[in-house]
Amino acid sequence: MGFLSKFFGKPKLDYQSRYELLKAAISGTMSKVYQAKDRKTGEIVALKILDKQKTADLEMRFKGTKRPSEGEIAIQFDHPYIVRTLEYGTTTDNCHYIVMEYLGGTGLNNVLVHKQDLMAGARMFYIRQAAEALQAVHEKGFIHRDICPRNLIFTGDFNILKLTDFGLSVPNREPFTLPGNRTGTPNYMAPELVRRRNTDHRLDIFSFGVTVYELCTRQLPWPRGTDGLAAMSHDQPGAPITDFRPDINKKLASAIHYCIESDIKKRCPDMATFLRMIAKVEYEDEKSFADMR
């Protein structure tokens, strides 16, 4: 196949022949994800089929820029806190597909609503895992562009939280950092993105900060909304996290607010800095921390 692919390209995937679809698809903004079983190997995987029209619309935004595809970006990562991509390509009906490891858990967004007790005493572990995952993305030279609870997935035993979905990701360089492409999840979007200014990896740090704020409080720093207008207030200071968690560890609170600084020049510069700031924080609240001493 390697010899032929040099001349004819990678063979297209007839995914319904290769995989047994075990669970109905979970529909996202631009794709459907199935739990699937490889008919030959028996391996259980997550099979992501991208919507043809929505993918084409996104590619038009980057026309002429040679933006790498989601699969090309995702397969570069071999990290314990990033969902592993096994292969990617095009199906026989000309849709992009990505085969990933199957985690068996649910998204952080669902846990925040329905299963808060699962995180009791473990939030700092999850915060560090997500921070290290994002650090790895930035060190590879990419901006994720859609850090939010929906894109952080638990393993089935809830021991590990992994980053996924590189559908909006771009290289951290021009022309991808120039103003004009306003994509992401509004409640977590950085103000420079909303206001169509130059961007870089720090827009992810803002989104990460909002996500961790919500992980600790079940609230957002700004009023929640359902459309692009939700992000228009993000260039104003957010509500102090102590309004919702008076007992939160002061070092953690300071690190979170450093991430959600509206002025990009005053924002946490990288995930290594955030990780250093929380290095000695064992629990998210002051009482548990005091008990440990």
Give the positions of each predicted feature.
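Protein kinase catalytic-loop region centered on the HRD/HxD motif
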Residues: 132-142
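AlphaC helix of the eukaryotic protein kinase fold
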Residues: 56-76
